[in-house]
């Protein structure tokens, strides 16, 4: 049985994520930014407008978790 190096596994994983993101993100952004919020109440509309900011905060938290985990190794 062939043992795969951790670096190769990480490189393949990053490659797969980039390919999936390149295919799925344009459609997701199109659906999010073209959604009609005219019939929604003001509270839901406000949360919808904050969605990009909440996404950025989530990504930053993910990177902090990853960096702390990598620092412990």
Curated annotation (Swiss-Prot):
Main location per the UniProt record: virion
Keyword Transport applies: no
Keywords: Lipoprotein, Virion
Ranges where the record places region Hydrophobic: 9-29, 47-67
GO cellular component terms, A-Z: virion component
SS bond list: none
Modifications made to the protein after synthesis: Probable lipoprotein. Lipid modification may enable hydrophobic interactions leading to the flexible nature of the virion. The protein probably exists in 2 forms, a lipid-modified one and an unmodified or less extensively modified one.
Lipid metabolism in keyword set: no
Subcellular localization(s) per the UniProt record: Virion
Source organism superkingdom: Viruses
Leftover remarks: The virion does not contain any lipid membrane.
Annotated protein name in UniProt: Major capsid protein
Organism: His1 virus (isolate Australia/Victoria)
């Amino acid at each position: 049985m062939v043992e795969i190096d951790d670096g190769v596994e990480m490189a393949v994983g990053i490659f797969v994520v980039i390919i999936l993101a390149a295919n799925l993100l344009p459609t997701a952004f199109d659906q999010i930014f073209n959604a009609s919020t005219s019939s929604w109440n003001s509270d839901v509309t406000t949360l919808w407008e904050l969605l990009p900011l909440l996404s950025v905060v989530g990504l930053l938290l993910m990177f902090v978790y990853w960096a702390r985990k990598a620092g412990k190794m």
